[in-house]
Amino acid sequence: MKNQSSTPASQWARRDFLKTSAVTFLGLAFTRLPVMAGPATRADFDQLVPADKKLSPEWVKSLFERGTPQVLRGRELQFVGMPVGGIGAGQLYLGGDGRLWHWDIFNQFIFTGAEHYAKPLMPSSPLTQKFSLTLGDKVVSLDRDGFSDVSFRGEYPIGVVNYADANLPIAVKLEAFSPFIPLNTDDSSLPVTVFQFTIRNLSAATVETTLTGELENGACLYHRNRSGVLKNSFVMTQSTTMLLCSAEAENDANRMARPDIIFEDWNHENYSGWTVAGAAFGSGPIKKSAIPSYQGDVGGDTARVVNSHATATGESIELKDAATGKLISRDFLIERNFITFWIGGGKAKGNSQLGLSLVVDGKTVLAASGKDDNAMSLQYFEVAAYAGKKAHLEIIDDATGTWGNVGVGKITFTDEHGKTELMEKLSDFGTMALALLGDADEISGDKSAIFSEKLIGTLGKKLTLAAGESKTVTFVLAWHFPNLSIKNAFANCGRYYATKFPSAQAVVEYVAKNFPRLAGQTKLWRDTWYDSTLPFWFLDRTFLNTSILATSTCYRLANGRFYGWEGVGDCAGTCGHVYLYAQAIARLFPELERDLRERTDFGLAQKPDGAIRFRGEFNHIPAVDAQSGYVLRALREHQMSVDDQFLRRIWPKVKLAMEWLITKDGNADGLIESNQHNTLDTDWHGKVAWLSGLYLAALAAAAQMADEVGDTEFAAQCRKILAAGQRNFAKQLFDGEYFSNQVDPKHLAAINSGTGCEIDQVFGQSWAFQIGLPRVLPPKQTVSALKSLWRYNFAPDAGDYHKKMGPGRWYAMPGEAGLLMCTFPRRGWDYAQAKGKGPEWAAGYFNECMNGFEHQVAGHMIWEGMTLEGLAVERALHDRYAASRRNPWNEIECGDHYARSMASYGVYLAACGFEYHGPKQHIGFAPKLTPEDFQCAFTSAEGWGRFSQTTESGKRKAEITVLWGSLKLKTIALENESAHSVKVFLAGQLLSVNVKRTGKRALITLKNSVQISAGEKLEIRFA
């Protein structure tokens, strides 16, 4: 699609561009969202990206205010889907009213793309699961159907649902979660969801009620067309009452073998026993010898077959494929377990009907088609679940395009089928459990049922509540489906949790035994995160993307490997230039990132020359941004380690990766010029600001790691190239306002943002802040570049920009604000030139708002002191994912729960000014919001806790409190401009220290290293 603007971007003078004015204001249609901009004049609508954003004072104020926790009600509940399973254990949503939905725990492949932004998923469930209360003779479901006033507060990992109704004497609070304990990866990877219900009597009289949990047996849920038995049983232990759901094959040992029934062999000249419609099937089955030679050998084991191409009217291939028709068989009773058949021809696509279908009770229950191949293959329907029912077969050719034909051979009814997969090997074979912690007063559903029937079990707890009294009841839902295969990636890779537990029963027993610790530490982390001075909205947005780990984007395989899609079911290989942006995993569960570096990136993915395939074993080329990222991430993972053993193990491979980048540089001037594959999915050519900037950051990281392992020669080499690159980067790529690219004139056909204002142009410096490197890019020009992104790329109505500029995917609808990927404010370079002859889908990225990139820039702005702009970018994104519009817990790019969005944790680190180096026993904070009164959570290699600093009478006091694990410290970096002396206390004991001041920064060195244990506090007093 060509640029639709009436004034091409290439004709916009800078002065004219700066005169563009505001569009509309955000949140007009959603009154609960704070108004971002306005009022605007009619002239403000004339241009798409105004220099003056016309931010309303109220909206700006809301960016900085602590505010109150956001509680969702009414229509805001409709899209809510907060993941409540363990890391890599599947995907299960807690809905806005407490119901579970999107049960992606059965190892079924689900593909997602970009569509769920414009059309959000609505709650649905393949099985019955619910909780209810019995009050007298009334059963009240714990959802919006049962209570008139339902509210939801999501504080990941815990979702809180409150239920009230003026007509009921009780109120209920639900806290639902899966154990989530930073640094304790295994206990955060359990296939379990906990439900803690607190029921309160609001009346003046005693209330008797029963809280009941209900669960349908979901074992073999997607294979109910075969024969099998569902089994429910109850297991009572000292601490739990458990409904255990399983499945097993029918016992066929005593069944007499039944002979096959050949239903149709086509060895007759007409369609005797079949009703014929249309022109595709002719007057009867065709001899294989009469089939046109260009169709080849169609196979099968009969002389005649059905072939809707060979028998169709028409003289050309196109006319024959365009013919349509249908064959309908005589009715029959299903008396065998399988129907086998030979089938070939076209593959059913879209809404067209093509192939063989089984119709039972007037409904199509099973269907098969060819594989766009004339050669037929032997396939089967498993029909035991329909035994005794009347049925018929239909052979349908409703397709009119290429491969619009079907071929069918012999059809047999049989009990024996060599291709039958053993039940215990099925993807959804396994167990489920719903347990009540404690004794149940009522149970039901202890029985068996055949696969074609539903099997539901219940557990109930009776409660007697005095006036005003509250009681808490806890249920645990667990699942165990070990037979994982990942489409387009791994066959039979298995689930990590299945190596720890043999069944759902074992999962429940582990959780019950350790419940006080698991629940207590999960809530402790939640409370620590929110016990902060940072705004509630900011804490919500920067942490909630951590839930991506608990979706089907991420997996823990049976061999312990961490693996991920880019987004759910989309783009294999734990993509290096997507996960490059993600900061959450490394800080919360660093062992996963260390495994990814050691096992995959610097292991199976690395070539002998040092290049790293950015999709591991699933592609064969490196990407320049990913390659730099592997080096940067190696330093980060080293910093989140206790000692230097990890770095020493991987250093030779890290060095090799860096040497490949240096070779890519060619002339060692610090700027890469040759082909550069990258996260925008094509090769760019020439001097590209953001790719060379990342390269410079990687050089700085490699130099630091080389220092730490004693490779002084390589450290010097990296720093020499870095120094040259820093000079050339500023001199050659800075245009006085921002950094742009020098396009290789030999590759004008390739996509390149050229002189456009590109979102990642100073990404290298953003990364340098994340890992505490010295400055990589010049401060003045870098800030100017960020200001240019604010000026040229931040659109109060990014959806309108996309609508008018096109093409691209919809990640911001009209009326929604966002930071655009690239705009073209300079003469001589516009979208058409940036596209060159590249694919429209890739060039269309320039017109989009992509969450992960926006998080990255927002964090960088905050690091550089552009706090208002950084918060505005982050808040605009947050408001796009308002619950009234779409699921707040599903940031979408190329797939649901897109991994790049875990960059949001980096925005939080920027606000804290956080720095950490475990092996050096160093920690530091430089808060960017309210430094005079600041509090935040932090993580380290072995522990986590709370940092705070306050100022009274001009004197600052800081505290580092460890709440879980431990923290070893030798140095502490803080900011204080006026302090003359520093005193440090641990558990009340004064420590001997040395202080070095550089500007506002005070580096405090302890004479002796200390270890702060859980419950202990280190206090720093400035005077």
Segments from the language model and where they lie:
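Non-catalytic C-terminal accessory modules of carbohydrate-active enzymes
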Residues: 88, 99-101, 107-175, 182-185, ...
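Short beta-strands within extracellular/lumenal beta-sheet-rich domains
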Residues: 310-335, 377-379, 459-460, 956-958
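N-terminal secretory signal peptides and thylakoid transit peptides that target proteins
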Residues: 5-25
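Extended extracellular/luminal ectodomain segments enriched in beta-structured repeat modules
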Residues: 332-340, 389, 966-969
